[in-house]
Amino acid sequence: MAEEPGVWSLLERAPIDWTEPWLIGLAAFHILCFIVTYISFKSYPLQICHFLLMVVLVSCAEYINEFAAMHWRAYSKQQYFDSSGMFISLAFSAPLLCNTIIIVVHWVYKTLCVMTELKTLQQKRKESREKRKKKE
């Protein structure tokens, strides 16, 4: 029985030249986005701006795909941008959407923490009122 090919061997066999400068730049852009996502956990305004920027970029992916399909010879050795938008969806939009999901999960976690803290304070306040009533 043949062994399943790994992700790396699939990437090597794909008809994509990963050494093209613009693909390396795209990978660097996504790494930078992940770093900013991590850093933005400490700054809520930065996180909101970063989130909105990524959402806008994903929503503009169709237009970027059309532009890239028309001008691919200027920066690439092959045409990656087809009418279905599969390449741009996987190489551009998917990593950005992963970042936005990470941010949304972080927001849900922070909201749950605040709700838990609020409920704890409400319980303490209720207990202190009951203690005061018993003393009176």
Swiss-Prot record:
Gene Ontology molecular function: DNA binding
Subcellular location(s) of the protein: Nucleus membrane
Similarity comment text for this entry: Belongs to the TMEM18 family.
Membrane topology: Multi-pass membrane protein
Keywords: Coiled coil, DNA-binding, Membrane, Nucleus, Transmembrane, Transmembrane helix
InterPro entries recorded: TMEM18
Pfam families in UniProt: TMEM18 (PF14770)
Region of interest: DNA-binding: 106
Main location, first listed in the record: nucleus
Domain of life: Eukaryota
PANTHER family: TRANSMEMBRANE PROTEIN 18
Residues passing through the membrane, by range: 21-41, 44-64, 85-105
Perinuclear space side: 1-20, 65-84
Coiled-coil stretches noted in the UniProt entry, renumbered to this chain: 112-136
Protein name: Transmembrane protein 18
One GO location term (cellular component): nuclear membrane
Membrane side Nuclear: residue ranges: 42-43, 106
